[in-house]
Amino acid sequence: KNYAVNVKDVSKMVEGSYEGNEKYVFLTFDDGPSPLTEQVLDILKNENVKGTFFMLGSRLDSGQAPKESLKRAIEEGNAIANHSYSHNFKKLYPGNITDVNYFMDEFRKTNDIMRDVLGVEFDTNVLRMPGGYNSRVYYKDRNLEELDNNLESNKIVSIDWNALNGDAEGKPYTLNEMIDYVKRTSRGKNQVVLLMHDTFGKEKTVKILPEIIKYYKEEGYEFKTISDANV
């Protein structure tokens, strides 16, 4: 069974310009791998659904366990994408303006680490910018055009999200509030790209994940992954 949807189509889904009315949900996890990634993978396997992991190069570099999580995620049919190396806003966006050369270096560095783990044939051009691409638009980042040109010439597609569980919103939510947040932000959308985090301290995300999956199953969504535009 093919779970993958081309990132260019997913990009349209997030922007609301996609023409189709298929009910798709993309479970996306940022900032891993961490010890919680294994628990997330257990749940996905148990529920027989797939997800997309936007991984940090610095986390992959931090030891053998994160590399094993990366391998396992791929072996079990999930998708892997690039979330920068450092996630360090001061380096990526000094003065809240993208340092394009530095940003691109981090993207390449992270892909290289993934390749070291998964083999030379691995490549991804799927990116999620730390903070999201739309935050750059919101802050009127004056280097956005230069960044866009760089992404385009490297065939890299940046993907944000259109639903979230609130696990990175600054204020702590109860489990029920997080589940409600997912339902509220997903309502009325045929294609949902759900933002979650599988990094340290996100135990609540793991706890509610089976419930979230159940919700989308009951609502008739198919679970999909975000695939490379070059595939």
Regions found by a protein language model. Name each.
Residues 61, 65, 87-195, 199-217, ...:
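Catalytic domains of cell-wall/extracellular-matrix polysaccharide-remodeling enzymes
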Residues 1-128, 231:
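Active-site beta->alpha N-cap acidic-glycine motif
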